[in-house]
Swiss-Prot record:
Gene3D superfamilies registered for this protein in UniProt: 2.60.40.650, Cytochrome b5-like heme/steroid binding domain, Nucleotide-binding domain of ferredoxin-NADP reductase (FNR) module, Oxidoreductase, molybdopterin-binding domain, Translation factors
Induction (record text): By nitrate.
Organism the protein comes from: Cucurbita maxima
Residues that, per the record, bind Mo-molybdopterin: 195
Needed co-factor(s): FAD; heme; Mo-molybdopterin
Record text on cofactor binding: Binds 1 FAD per subunit. Binds 1 heme group per subunit.
Full protein name: Nitrate reductase [NADH]
Length: 918
């Protein structure tokens, strides 16, 4: 843990952030060509930037006047909230077109560079640094408001946008934005939004959930201008319960991959939707400005006291129904399942569809924000003579008021009651929609004897927070006591101090006492015997630690180390045994590959990895390379230069795009449908027309994308020739949801690719694979040369692509006399990929023979085999076993295990040496 003296900050004494930022003119956060630019609000009541009323229609003013009697408490706070908004904006650096959004469909959106990105480049899921969030206090500036996006932000225009109300209503209608603005009463009020995953990383440190790593800043408060939902539904004549109107569903505009392709949607009960006490609204302004693109421009739902997942952004449809929403995200998101339910059990036993596990209202929660993580409190004559002020926030759900916050410094033996600050007043129904703040002065000498500080809150129903964390599959609603650990340190020669440690740091940032204790726990449970490998001396796995720079040196076949979840592994002796070949390890050697490892490995593989652990990564208070996408939020770094344009190294021009250990961004430039479920995707290379992909024949690439907040990586073999310049092509079979009984949700990556818009970008990594065809019958297999005059090439389904690549390379060389015998199995004729190309090549070249096998023929006159690959089929259509004959195979594991391997053995093939499986 890093310690500093000269530039350290002290929680209650820390300087305001305005010292390192500049004032700027308030305005929308987007560039000149943004589709939301130029939208104005002719009937807005208040210009917050100039603190003066704006023109408003008589109709709206009259409607507002009718509410004056009941809105005193809100109006009393209006000037105070306005001042907070203006002050917060003036202290905030301008948002920028972040280089991390280059090559994505969100590249037009300006964002605050200090936001901590939780899911890589795209989609944009982020939270502000906790200390910045708390600096602004009650009202969060829009650029620092947490963001939860499932996919691409829709490009919307105010003039074209409509919201449809349909279903069980007497008068279905579509409302333009101007109608929503001019024809309905409005009032502004503050509401706190919280992601149900707030504090999830604490759960992930105990056991990995299926969600990404939210820290404790997935919470923000804004002032929202609104159209009451109940008014809109009354205008449309919502039907009664007796006539079946039981639920109100909301649907957004974004196209998402979940469930095989869908919009984001959810629902609430009709009684809630029509309850005026709930203040459920269609919001079109946030903190006195139009909604930002990331927050739902031009209109979104706000349901105070509920989790953020119910507040649909980019709202397009409101449907009154009898049943609750049947949207994929309504069922497969925002659930708290029992702790024993893992992903397999949840799917097998349909836990997702049990209504008792849905999350609506927030639970009671509280967090310690001062002291900051890794803050150092020096112990000297001056600091011990004055109290130290602990601070934090708290919130509850359903409009319930937080009534008490308590702090313990002796593990719950005794509790001290904190001072509460409630900046909001209740609405006329007694509801509280916002967070509050707590503080407690403690003696520094008491901190010296405390091992930890913990906080818990109570609301008006006397609910409080549990002492211990309760894990659940989605990692949601974590509200156990928030604990900050204390340790003694020597920040400078002759000084001692107390260093404070929060449980975790958000995203993939390392740090936090849970991270440290997890490492120690695993070390204790691991085999304590000494281990030795080719590349490392004897070492004790429980005590060895390494810096990132040390690990970086081990990036070769002679010594291949990787970092996963803060542990260091020496994988050198596993290189020859890895099913995907040594490239699969070497491509990440010397790096932190946590996300990629988790994306493509099973639980079994993760357990196997423990055999290769040699120590732990040393973490400091400063950002490492593995967290370079996040700002340096250490409390020891007082300077903030996030308002400056980042200095980036110019990319080195190179003839080939692929480079080991690097992900390269490639833009989708065309998408062609070959059939109802087969697509050809063409991706441009970053180096333009003078650059080749650089993929050796026989090897593959990883396609990387963030889907539903998690990194997804899949191996693909391009079908374009290796000498194509400026682009590569993939032929992909899209596995849609609900088609294959064994895979009801379909293929994650293939559906994601199908949903991509032309112009959007994904990452590519490679080359990978243990087989390389070097030409004229020569192969390199696991680094050793092999030769064949004849090739038996056996493929199943999409496994044709590496076979196709080798065939293509051989036929391109007129001096390559290698003979090829392809047997290609599929379910039906319609499933055969690249058939036209294969048939054309076979007619023109005597070196190539192609035979098809289908499980069932759906057309008359089928002249090839029906059924499965059998010994007889192979004897008729591939060469006999010989020293100069190799078999190449790629397809489903069952085909390789039960059809290819045993039947080749019956033909006397040496399958250990002469069968090469891609």
């Amino acid at each position: 843990m890093a310690a500093s003296v000269d530039n350290r900050q002290y929680g209650p004494l820390q300087p305001p952030l305005s010292g390192v930022v500049r004032s700027f003119k308030n305005g929308p956060n987007h560039r000149a060509d943004s589709p939301v630019r130029g939208c104005n609000f002719p009937n807005s009541n208040v210009d917050y930037n100039n603190n003066r009323p704006l023109k408003s229609s008589v109709k709206i003013q009259e409607a507002a006047a009718e509410e004056m009697e009941d809105s005193c408490s809100e109006d009393e706070n209006e000037n105070e909230f306005r001042d907070l908004i203006v002050k917060g904006n003036r202290e905030l650096e301008p948002s920028i077109l972040d280089h991390r959004d280059e090559g994505t469909a969100d590249n037009w959106i300006e964002r605050n560079a200090s936001m901590v990105r939780l899911t890589g480049k795209h989609p944009f899921n982020s939270e502000p640094p906790l200390n910045r969030l708390m600096h602004h206090g009650f009202i969060t500036p829009v650029p620092l408001h947490y963001v939860r996006n499932h996919g691409v932000v829709p490009k919307a225009k105010w003039a074209d946008w409509t919201v449809e109300v349909c279903g069980l209503v007497k008068r279905p209608a579509k409302f333009t934005m101007d109608q929503l603005l001019n024809e309905f009463r409005f009032r502004e009020f503050p509401a706190t939004l919280v992601c149900a995953g707030n504090r999830r990383k604490e759960q992930n440190m105990v056991k990995q959930s299926i969600g990404f790593n939210w820290g404790a800043a997935g919470v923000s408060t804004s002032v929202w201008r609104r159209v009451p939902l109940c008014d809109l539904l009354k205008r449309c004549g919502i039907l009664s319960r007796k006539k079946g109107a039981l639920n109100v569903c909301f649907e957004g505009a974004e196209d998402l991959p979940g469930g095989g392709g869908s919009k984001y949607g959810t629902s609430i009960k009709k009684e809630l939707a029509m309850d005026p006490a709930r203040d459920i609204i269609l919001a079109y302004m946030q903190n006195g400005e139009q909604l930002a693109p990331d927050h739902g421009f031009p209109v979104r739902m706000i349901i105070p006291g509920f989790i953020g997942g119910r507040m649909v952004k980019w709202l397009k449809r409101i449907i009154v129904t009898t049943k609750e929403s049947e949207n994929y995200y309504h069922f497969k998101d925002n659930r708290v399942l029992p702790s024993h339910v893992d992903a397999d059990v949840a799917n097998a036993e349909a836990w997702w569809y049990k209504p008792e596990h849905i999350i609506n209202e927030l639970n009671i929660n509280s967090v310690i924000t001062t002291p900051c993580h890794e803050e150092i409190l020096p112990i000297n004559a001056w600091t011990t003579q004055r109290p130290y002020t602990l601070r934090g926030y708290s919130y509850s759900g359903g409009g319930k008021k937080v009534t008490r916050v308590e702090v313990t410094m002796d593990s719950g033996e005794t509790w001290q009651v904190c001072t509460l600050d409630h900046p909001e007043k209740a609405n006329k129904y007694g509801k509280y929609w916002c967070w509050c703040f707590w503080s407690l002065e403690v003696e520094v000498l008491d901190l010296l004897s405390a091992k930890e500080i913990a906080v818990r809150a109570w609301d008006e129903t006397h609910n409080t927070q549990p002492e211990k964390l309760i894990w659940n599959l989605m990692g949601m609603m974590n509200n156990c006591w928030f604990r900050v650990k204390t340790n003694m340190c020597k920040p400078h020669k002759g000084e001692i101090g107390i260093v404070f440690e929060h449980p975790t740091q958000p995203g993939n940032q390392s740090g936090g006492w849970m991270d440290r204790e997890r490492h120690l726990e695993i070390s204790t449970e691991s085999n304590q015997t000494l281990k030795k490998s080719v590349s490392t001396p004897f070492m004790n796995t429980a005590s060895n630690t390494y810096t990132l720079s040390e690990v970086k040196k081990h990036n070769s076949p002679q010594s291949a180390w990787i970092i996963v979840h803060g542990h260091v592994y020496d994988c050198t002796r596993f290189l020859k045994d890895h099913p995907g070949g040594s490239d699969s390890i070497l491509i990440n050697a010397g790096t932190d590959c946590t996300e990629e490892f988790d994306a493509i490995h099973s639980d079994k593989a993760k357990k196997m990895l423990e055999d290769y652990r040699i120590g732990e990564l040393i973490t400091t208070g400063y950002a490492s390379d593995s967290s370079s996408n996040s700002p340096n939020n250490s409390t020891h770094g007082a300077s903030n230069f996030s308002h400056l344009a980042p200095i980036r190294e110019a990319p080195v021009s190179r003839r080939v795009a692929l480079a080991p250990n690097e992900k390269i961004p490639c833009k989708l430039i065309s998408k062609t449908s070959i059939s109802h479920d087969v697509r050809v995707f063409r991706f441009a290379l970053p180096g333009g027309q003078d650059q080749a992909l650089g993929l050796p024949v026989g090897k593959h690439i990883f396609i990387c994308a963030t889907v539903d907040g998690k990194l997804c990586m899949r191996a693909y073999t391009p079908t374009s020739s290796i000498d194509e310049m400026g682009f590569f092509e993939l032929v992909v079979k899209v596995y849609f949801k609900g088609v294959h009984p064994k895979f009801p949700n379909g293929g994650i990556m293939s559906q994601y690719l199908d949903s991509m818009e032309v112009g959007s970008t994904l990452d590519v990594k490679g080359p990978l694979g243990h087989i390389e065809y070097t030409g004229r019958g020569n192969f390199m297999v696991h680094g050793k040369p092999r030769f064949a005059r004849r090739l038996a090439m056996l493929a199943g389904g999409t496994g044709i692509t590496p076979i196709y690549q080798v065939v293509q390379a051989i036929l391109k060389d007129p001096e390559d006399e290698t003979e090829m015998y392809v047997v290609y199995a599929n379910r039906t004729e319609d499933d055969i990929l690249l058939r036209d190309e294969l048939d054309t090549w076979a007619k023109k070249n005597q070196r190539l023979k192609v035979w098809y096998v289908v499980q069932e023929s759906i057309r008359e006159g089928w002249e090839y085999s029906v059924g499965f690959i059998t010994e007889n089929i192979l004897r008729e259509h591939i060469p006999a076993a010989a020293e100069d004959t190799l078999a190449l195979a790629c397809g489903p594991p069952a085909m390789i295990q039960f059809a290819v391997q045993p039947n080749l053995e019956k033909m006397n093939y040496d399958t250990k040496n002469s069968l090469l499986v891609f």
